[in-house]
Amino acid sequence: MSNEFIYGIHAVRAVLDKEPERFIEAYVLKGRQDDRLMPILNELQMVGVSLQQMTRKTLDDKAHGANHQGIIARVKPAKQLNENDLDDILAKHASPLLLILDGVTDPHNLGACLRNADAAGVAAVIVPKDKSAPMTATVSKVACGAAETVPLVRVTNLARTMRHLQEQGIWIVGTAGEATHDIYQAKLTGSLAIVMGAEGDGMRRLTRETCDDLIKIPMAGAVSSLNVSVASGICLFEAVRQRLASQ
């Protein structure tokens, strides 16, 4: 498996805190004095990571023009989680909150959804292997460290995985514009998985049919839908609100 690149202060910090053994080397902007960056560089050196100073143009080229904040790191790939890891993840949570993404293939959207999931205390994000954005430096950067903290589980058969979750007592709600009730009318407490479909196409038919319930976000304006990362944030934090209120 090939090595990966991560860039940006948040992404590098997250790996450094959780899995420092993954670092191979780091590239830093020559002459940069940054109060947020210097502690990271010191810690990288303490764990034996080689630092190479580079010009801004060289770093920009390595990051393909994205905002690298003066640091890029080459790391060993993270362990890939699959359906066999789900039971261990669920066992760590009394009432797990899960996010299922069906067909989210844009890396910016996946990264933003991971960031939402981290903020909402989601136990895991579940995606299908064949219809999801791969883990890239862009996903990691947009996630601001959440790609390194939130378990991302890639499954072979999403509908089968959903049925397994249901057997474990997890209620699964899918988001769909044609749903008859909205997220503010739905009960989003207890062991719960929220399913978000691809922007435009929504959930695939079998995914939709496997859900226990369908809900929608009430829309008062002219647009008919929201970006999937925005929609996931709204749904997750309505679930968080209800869960806090029920304590």
From Swiss-Prot:
Disulfide bonds: none annotated. S-adenosyl-L-methionine binds at residues 197, 217, 226. The keyword rRNA processing applies. GO terms for molecular function: RNA binding; rRNA (guanosine-2'-O-)-methyltransferase activity. CDD domains: SpoU-like_RlmB. It is an enzyme of class 2 (transferase). One of its GO terms (cellular component) is cytosol. It catalyses: guanosine(2251) in 23S rRNA + S-adenosyl-L-methionine = 2'-O-methylguanosine(2251) in 23S rRNA + S-adenosyl-L-homocysteine + H(+). Its EC number is 2.1.1.185. It is found in: Cytoplasm. Keywords: Cytoplasm, Methyltransferase, rRNA processing, S-adenosyl-L-methionine, Transferase. Belongs to the class IV-like SAM-binding methyltransferase superfamily. RNA methyltransferase TrmH family. RlmB subfamily. PANTHER family: 23S RRNA (GUANOSINE-2'-O-)-METHYLTRANSFERASE RLMB. Specifically methylates the ribose of guanosine 2251 in 23S rRNA. HAMAP family: 23SrRNA_methyltr_B (MF_01887). This is 23S rRNA (guanosine-2'-O-)-methyltransferase RlmB. It comes from Vibrio vulnificus (strain YJ016). The lineage of its organism: Bacteria, Pseudomonadati, Pseudomonadota, Gammaproteobacteria, Vibrionales. The gene is rlmB.
